UniProtKB/Swiss-Prot annotation:
Protein's UniProt name: 23S rRNA (uracil(1939)-C(5))-methyltransferase RlmD
Organism this protein belongs to: Salmonella paratyphi A (strain ATCC 9150 / SARB42)
Positions contributing to [4Fe-4S] cluster binding: 81, 87, 90, 161
Protein keywords: 4Fe-4S, Iron, Iron-sulfur, Metal-binding, Methyltransferase, rRNA processing, S-adenosyl-L-methionine, Transferase
Gene3D superfamilies: 2.40.50.1070, Nucleic acid-binding proteins, Vaccinia Virus protein VP39
Length: 431
């Protein structure tokens, strides 16, 4: 009879070892060396020694947790948030901001095989102008409102959040009190807060109809707090209760948006990012510029203030329409927006027949692997690639380098201080 054996699991002895950390990865984990391989230890910083317990032992690397820290790095900070270490929102509040930026820049430089020329950053606290807080009301218990625990669907009841814009952070206890007073608390899903140029927005998701009394209470609350309130009974429906249509500023232009539309979370970094893109592209009065994955025009419209003509291309029809409206609202008549499948050959479209001098693209995390060959066909002089995923950026960059482009500028965008998120932008020039 045949006998079957399962593969042996690599068993760790759980022994305590003493190590010294010599590096910090972009996720805020300390990196030491043990048995000839990298050992990742959350919570430790470079120059710190600790007694640690191995929790995972792989062929190429291992992981450990701290049993006892033996000394403190001069770059260690006291976390400002009482929920740090439990809430999944921030991972690096114990790390000095300079060290955070250096470690992210080093990780980006390794991936791109190019030095980081610029760090684009704003204030490390109070920067987040958008947040979604989960809501839950267990039977016979108070309403829970907060963010998810790290690695869990459980909610951390958040009383304060130092990375939120101050206007939003100040609202948290009053929003909690208002929502807890409703009769339909068990039907509340989440609340989104946005600090726009037009003021504060509150979007309340609920899974069953709210009573007239609850709606009236919410409307009174919105008026007393001076915020715009929107109800979302279903995923595709948005009901305006109070307030005006929101807008935000991009390089001196006013961009209207729907409360659910994507806008960059960090306003200060977004403003610098747009300005740097214009500078790197060296947009001139005679240029034709193409903006791919353009959204509602965050880059497109500022580009149109300098270029002869700009084409914005986006895969979401509602954002294309919003871009057109924003162009009209800002008196820009040299910009056109088109809805296209960006995986298809955009060079065959009528609007591309005259070519483009400069190209900007700002894709989602999946990157733009299907788009690169079409960009190469256009033979632009300069390309700026804005990325929220350094791995896909490095992959897509290879296509441009192989086609004769060279990385001439690389910037790390510190869009999300105290987290492991790493964003960047690159300038490619045709050689």
């Amino acid at each position: 009879m045949a006998q079957f054996y399962s593969a042996k699991r690599r068993v760790t002895t759980r022994q305590i070892i003493t190590v010294k950390v010599n590096d910090l990865d972009s996720f805020g984990q300390g990196v030491a060396r043990h048995n000839g391989k990298a050992l990742f230890i959350p919570g430790l910083l470079p120059e710190e020694s600790a007694e640690v317990i191995i929790t995972e032992d792989k062929k190429q690397f291992a992981r450990a947790r701290v049993s006892r820290r033996l000394n403190d790095s001069p770059e260690r900070e006291t976390p400002r948030c009482p929920h740090f270490g439990v809430c999944g929102g921030c991972q690096q509040q114990h790390v000095g901001i300079d060290l955070q930026q250096r470690s992210k820049s080093a990780a980006l430089a390794r991936l791109m095989k190019h030095e980081v020329n610029d760090i684009i950053a704003g204030a490390p606290w109070g920067y987040r102008r958008r947040a979604r807080l989960s809501l839950n009301c267990p039977p016979d218990k108070p309403l829970q409102m907060g963010f998810r625990k790290a690695g869990s669907s459980d909610i951390v009841n958040v009383e304060q959040c130092p990375v939120l814009a101050p206007q939003l952070a100040a609202l948290l206890p009053r929003i909690r009190a208002c929502l807890a007073s409703l009769h339909g608390t068990r039907h509340l899903g989440h609340v989104e807060l946005v600090q726009a140029g037009s003021g504060t927005l509150m979007i309340l998701r609920h899974t069953a109809p709210l009573s007239a009394a609850d709606k009236e209470k919410l409307e009174r609350f919105s008026h007393s707090e001076g915020l715009s309130l929107f109800l979302a009974p279903f995923s595709e429906i948005l009901e305006t209760v109070s307030g005006e249509a929101p807008w935000y500023d991009s390089h001196g232009l006013r961009l209207a948006f729907s409360p659910r539309d994507f806008i960059q979370v960090n306003e200060a970094v977004n403003q610098q990012m747009v300005a740097r893109a214009l500078e790197w592209l060296d947009v001139r009065a005679e240029d034709r510029v193409l903006d791919l994955f353009c959204g509602m025009g965050n880059f497109t419209l500022p580009l149109a203030t300098r270029a002869a003509s700009v084409v914005g291309v986006e895969g979401v029809p509602a954002l294309v329409e919003k871009g057109r409206e924003n162009a009209i609202r800002n008196g820009l008549h040299n910009v056109t927006f088109f809805h296209e499948n960006l995986e298809e050959d955009v060079t065959k479209q009528p609007w591309a027949k005259n070519g483009f001098d400069k190209v900007l693209l700002d894709p989602a995390r999946a990157g733009a692997t299907g788009v690169m060959r079409h960009i190469i066909k256009l033979k632009p002089i300069r390309i700026v690639y804005v990325s929220c995923n350094p791995a896909t950026l490095a992959r897509d960059s290879e296509a441009l380098v192989n086609a004769g482009y060279e990385v001439t500028r690389l910037a790390m965008l510190d869009m999300f201080p105290h987290t492991g998120h790493l964003e960047s932008m690159v300038l490619f020039e045709r050689m």
